[in-house]
């Protein structure tokens, strides 16, 4: 037995001398229950992670990350080719499609490690959410990102915010002068959402001075990114739906051109 382990065992034995078996059993059960609760909230992932700001947001490390050629949604990771070194993984999809990375974070380290980089999870921060929930979702995004970095993955912070009231915490834990990612999904047909996107993006650029922005989705008209390099990626879901619509239209035209014949 390792000497350190043996000394610890002897120490526990001396500590428990004269203690009833019931007290010892209760102590063990309480400790196990406490650890189970801590794991439920992924608190062990905070070990060796620096936190910043009023709400103790996990601080991501600055990494030298090259912009990938393409981005795919996390929901397509399992079906991707084995070698995906020129591709990054994004989470600009519905929360239910990636909630498992929070519930079982260690399970997805190896699959995500096949890709060039991975964006931090984009847990929703809707305007009508309670403030506590928005803070919690930003915290979860940072913590999972910090954990992936500790596991050796190349991680790009995802910018997420709601209204101006969220600006005080939603950019905490993101290193300045680094590469960040942002999505415009859902902003183009909603004037209020587009306005808050503009306000939040301007604030993020002023505060973080990012070196590079990975922009997922159609650009917001006439938005000025200044001297920041912008790498644009198409919304693959929109492209996929357009393709399906074109295929459906082509099939409909073929059906009209070749009507079924009736046999006498």
Per-region residue spans from a language model:
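C-terminal accessory extensions appended to soluble enzyme cores
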Residues: 1-63, 226-264
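Non-catalytic, usually N-terminal nucleic-acid engagement modules in DNA/RNA processing proteins
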Residues: 38-109, 129, 254-262
């Amino acid at each position: 037995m390792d000497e350190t382990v043996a000394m610890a065992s002897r120490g526990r034995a001396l500590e428990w001398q004269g203690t009833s078996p019931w007290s010892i059993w209760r102590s063990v059960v309480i400790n196990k229950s406490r650890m189970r609760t801590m794991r439920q909230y992924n608190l062990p992932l905070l070990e060796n992670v620096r936190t910043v700001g009023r709400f103790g947001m996990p601080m991501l490390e600055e990494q030298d990350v090259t912009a990938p050629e393409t981005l795919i949604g996390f929901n397509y990771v399992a079906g991707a080719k084995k070698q995906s070194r020129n591709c990054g993984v994004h989470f600009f999809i519905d929360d239910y499609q990636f909630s498992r990375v929070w519930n079982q974070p260690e399970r997805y380290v190896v699959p995500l490690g096949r890709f060039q980089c991975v964006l931090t999870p984009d847990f929703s921060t809707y305007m009508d959410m309670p403030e506590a929930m928005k803070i919690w979702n930003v915290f979860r995004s940072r913590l999972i990102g910090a954990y992936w970095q500790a596991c050796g993955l190349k991680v790009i912070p995802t910018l997420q915010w709601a209204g101006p009231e969220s600006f005080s915490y939603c950019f905490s834990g993101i290193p300045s002068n680094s590469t960040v990612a942002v999505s415009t999904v859902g902003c183009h047909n909603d004037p209020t959402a587009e306005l808050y996107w503009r306000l939040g993006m301007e604030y993020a650029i002023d505060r973080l001075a990012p070196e590079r922005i990975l922009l997922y989705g159609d650009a917001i008209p006439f938005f000025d990114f200044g001297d920041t390099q912008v790498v644009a990626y198409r919304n693959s879901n929109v492209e996929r739906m357009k393709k399906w619509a074109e295929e459906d239209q082509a099939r409909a035209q073929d059906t009209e051109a070749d009507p079924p014949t009736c046999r006498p």
